[in-house]
């Protein structure tokens, strides 16, 4: 089994046991898409709270998610991403709930979403943006979840890894498209993935490059075609995450 296949098998078990929550009031913050459209002079940052990963194992198990998120916000991050997968990334929906209560900016629920139950749970916990990963879904599931998320007044970050997936994301009208430099089957990372796919951008979406960023020089590689980068591990390993996050702000 690949990493992705293993994660999805476990996710199906997790979701089967997950209750269907009633939709509660949505947390108030700004639209991340509108924020990116209005702030184009600088590469914006999605800063991630991530305790562990399947490929790297434990990254920062002792992190205080709220303090980490507040450091990111103080550094000027446009959004906080919170891993909520409990098995492979050692996250939880409670991490997201606590972060959302304590920051003003949008919060992304970073998980392998395969059910509307997860969308409602994310919204109720304070997420205003959710991740849909094309390689984890059939096209029919993708469209269904995309429409369900929009009906819940959630923004959707649609994640792609190749030209075919990018074409699908653009076809369904995704406003936020993330190019993951990490192959979810092997977990190998290469920023060149984002460089290659940029030539195929053809919509009014905002584009985010995800994974593999450690320095401002890394970010500069994608600064002409992308609106933002998503950074997790590099910030989670830093003793001073606010300074580390500030160091990744690059002029476009």
Curated annotation (Swiss-Prot):
It catalyses: 1-(2-carboxyphenylamino)-1-deoxy-D-ribulose 5-phosphate + H(+) = (1S,2R)-1-C-(indol-3-yl)glycerol 3-phosphate + CO2 + H2O. Pathway: Amino-acid biosynthesis; L-tryptophan biosynthesis; L-tryptophan from chorismate: step 4/5. It is an enzyme of class 4 (lyase). GO terms for biological process: L-tryptophan biosynthetic process. The keyword Amino-acid biosynthesis applies. InterPro entries: Aldolase_TIM (IPR013785), Indole-3-glycerol_P_synth (IPR045186), Indole-3-glycerol_P_synth_dom (IPR013798), Indole-3-GlycerolPSynthase_CS (IPR001468), RibuloseP-bd_barrel (IPR011060). Pfam families: IGPS. The keyword Lyase applies. Signal peptide: none annotated. It comes from the Bacteria. GO terms for molecular function: indole-3-glycerol-phosphate synthase activity; phosphoribosylanthranilate isomerase activity. Its EC number is 4.1.1.48. SUPFAM superfamilies: Ribulose-phoshate binding barrel (SSF51366). Keywords: Amino-acid biosynthesis, Aromatic amino acid biosynthesis, Decarboxylase, Lyase, Tryptophan biosynthesis. Belongs to the TrpC family. This is Indole-3-glycerol phosphate synthase. The gene is trpC.
């Amino acid at each position: 089994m690949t990493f992705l296949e293993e994660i999805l098998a476990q996710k199906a078990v997790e979701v089967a046991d997950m209750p269907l929550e009633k939709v509660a009031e949505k947390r108030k913050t700004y639209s991340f898409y509108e924020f990116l459209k209005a702030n184009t002079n600088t590469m914006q940052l999605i800063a991630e709270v991530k305790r562990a990963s399947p490929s790297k194992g434990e990254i920062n198990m002792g992190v205080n998610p709220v303090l980490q998120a507040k450091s990111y916000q103080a550094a000027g991050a446009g959004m906080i991403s919170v891993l909520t997968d409990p098995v492979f990334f050692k996250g939880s929906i409670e991490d997201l709930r606590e972060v959302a209560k304590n920051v003003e900016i949008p919060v992304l629920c970073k998980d392998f979403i395969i059910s509307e139950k997860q969308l409602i749970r994310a919204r109720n916990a304070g997420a205003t943006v959710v991740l849909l990963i094309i390689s984890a879904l059939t096209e029919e599931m993708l469209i269904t979840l995309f429409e369900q998320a929009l009906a819940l007044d959630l923004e959707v970050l649609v994640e792609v890894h190749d030209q075919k997936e990018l074409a699908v994301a653009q076809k369904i009208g995704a406003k936020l498209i993330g190019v993951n430099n990490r192959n979810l089957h092997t977990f190998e990372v290469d920023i060149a993935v984002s460089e290659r796919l940029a030539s195929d951008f053809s919509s009014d979406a905002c584009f985010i490059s995800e994974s593999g960023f450690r320095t401002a020089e890394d970010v500069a590689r994608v600064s002409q075609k992308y609106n933002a980068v998503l950074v997790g591990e590099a910030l989670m390993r830093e003793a001073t995450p606010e300074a580390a996050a500030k160091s990744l702000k690059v002029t476009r």
